[in-house]
């Protein structure tokens, strides 16, 4: 039998590529999952047997001590309540969270046909209570425990949140004394029906794809209900991607969702135990109120503290006040301060739209006669109080601080 030399050469090249190519999630030794921790060591209520499927449990993934933020997340894999995508939407997610300083606990909840959805919800509630009862052991904070779910796991997280309750202080079981409420929630490509209100619905991060139309519609509806109830929420609907994308590794667009989630968790101040400071003040540029811009506090001594920005929309006041919106502001610590000057003139029209002279005290930020013309004159970023300063503008914010004023010079 003859062998084509070209085919042989190509086969050798292909073999070389296969040998040299790195394996995603590969390790020097086979992966050994952690031993599941039973949520009811003496048997779950309503258990119909004695197999693993009858024993709700969590698998524990703790971050290294030097990365631990004290934040924790119960991970609920999807699977239509008939199976669980434990690796794809469980272990891989938990490892990602652990690498970012967040303790992760993959939930083995009960599924059909032996059990009902209500049993899975009971397992999710028990997981929240179990973590609070063992917070010292796992080095997590009892008021920074959330839940992330995918597909059916997303529905489970919603159902658990909507039906959560306070603990029973007189219960014999220390776990039953704990609250089952979620401090925050992350929902991936799943939807749920439920009565949204500020008591039972925690701050929530949503992500889905437009291709996964049915689930995207349900998530938009839930987000809208939360928005109407003034509950903090953030939603991302990516254009491409079918149902069940997991981390979406390798997708340059959809694969951004884990970092967006982390940014949201950080912005919610869920990665520190420090309370926010209700800070406000004034900003001056060259001795005058800053016409229009922003002030940003960037943490220097705590890499997981939330960076915060307040906007100065000085369209109807002679002073350049800044204050933070829904959240009071930064947490105590050292910060680098950035002040942005966006434009000399706030208005884009070149005449008084009300056909009257503009009162001087209402347009103190306008430096030209009348309403002025459109301009981007002198758009600056100030990182120092004065251009000749050797060091950046920094401050230390302490607990109890309420007002902090700033003045920068352009020359």
Label the model's feature ranges.
Residues 216-225:
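Short alpha-helix in the alpha/beta-hydrolase fold that links the catalytic acid
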Residues 65-70, 75-117, 155, 167-168, ...:
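Short substrate-entry loop that stabilizes the transition state in hydrolases
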Residues 27-67:
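N-terminal cap/lid segment of alpha/beta-hydrolase-fold proteins
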Residues 85-87, 92, 107-139, 249-255:
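Catalytic nucleophile-loop/oxyanion-hole region of alpha/beta-hydrolase
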Residues 50, 61, 227-276:
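C-terminal catalytic histidine-bearing segment of alpha/beta-hydrolase fold enzymes
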Residues 271-411:
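Glycine/proline-rich low-complexity segments that form flexible loops, beta-turns, and polyproline
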Residues 205-208:
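Short beta-strand/loop motif that positions the catalytic acidic residue
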Residues 125-201:
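Primarily recognizes the serine-hydrolase "nucleophile elbow" in alpha/beta-hydrolase
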